[in-house]
């Protein structure tokens, strides 16, 4: 049952209307239905307004009145629905058609149309060709607003192979989750991958981990190398990737690393990659050409009595090319194959700590006993007798020339850091505050130049290795060997056995002071960083920091220098 004011689809009995498509009056015979006139007219008007089939019919909403007489204009009318007189393109009742219900009437008030309008033909509808759907329409429509599962599924379709599918899936899902809150960068990644780099995109950054590596499914690798292998080059190594100029994230950025695979290019490299080359850890024997004659030290020996390469021949062929020692970071070291000789005597202290504010040492040198304390805590406490518990309280150290920057930084030290000396000679660190570390071992694992960057650590309950005694021993052995070779070659040139032009190049940074800094010390800055991307270029410009001198590697360095001196004097 229809009620007043409700619209319905057009359905009339003996309905007459004007069809402008044929220019003639049409009478449609329909089965009689019990619709009231008001509902019929409102339904025709609804049909006209909704479907726009008859553009000449008036398009206006029904009007509601309160049972007052309505005077129609002087136009021809149709007295009833069963008899027709002059018709001007629409139905016009002879008197207002109404359905009274609570004194409410629905009246249709049309406006007559002219004969020119009735006879005019509507323009033909132009044919619109459908837009072709690109083959990768699903990828194009994928945005950062979609679910992580859908985005990951689309990105997996563009992998280049070469990696385990389960590893690829987990690596992509992990990346998408990290970028879900950075929609602009996630959109940039989707665009870069789905367009194969044809569309320029911005940097896609993730937070740099504490050791600079990405761990997925039990495997570790450098983040930008991992995703470059997934989406571009399955067999690429770290040393073959070069950052493009459009990448705005520097390689030594302390917090972020760009993993956009199209912000790097691959270059041909004949260098031997470091430990970052593969996601798999391979324990292959170290070649003798890298270890020299002192490669794997016999466990029965104490210290090598003579330095390596005793079979030095002072003569050089006139056309012999200059021997250039490869860069240290480019030569792989299998630390499991290196044996560190036992010390000739036990040490009383395993480290000593000096506290600095800017370039000024504050207080006395703090020494940590090797027998009583295997770990040391450096915090912002006020206990002046904390050394009895293996604790250095920086809050108890006064400085009459303390700057405002140092005062503010000291407030955030809190529980500080904890350094632990392990039985194998390695040193690990646990951070309870924001710190930046200078460590030669961390530089080696990251493949960067020694002492060139600060490694950022955030408060974390896990400990991380910041020094490896096997690595330090091997590196000091190499530099000492390089220095000895240069001395012998220089002596041969002076004696006339070879010209100076063919003298082997000495390995850089082979000086004692530099070896001590790179392999025997760790520096930790609290709160503030330093480096090329900061106003503070060196650690001596930071407000408060400590320098930890490790006595065990110092002992090794001293013995190596003694052996070199004995060889040089013999």
From Swiss-Prot:
Q: What SMART domains would the database entry show?
A: DWA, DWB
- State whether keyword Cytoplasm applies: yes
Q: What is its main location?
A: cytoplasm
Ranges of residues in domain MH2: 350-570
PROSITE patterns noted in UniProt? MH1, MH2
Q: Which family does it belong to?
A: Belongs to the dwarfin/SMAD family.
> What is this protein's function per UniProt?
Involved in TGF-beta pathway.
**Annotated protein name in UniProt:** Dwarfin sma-4
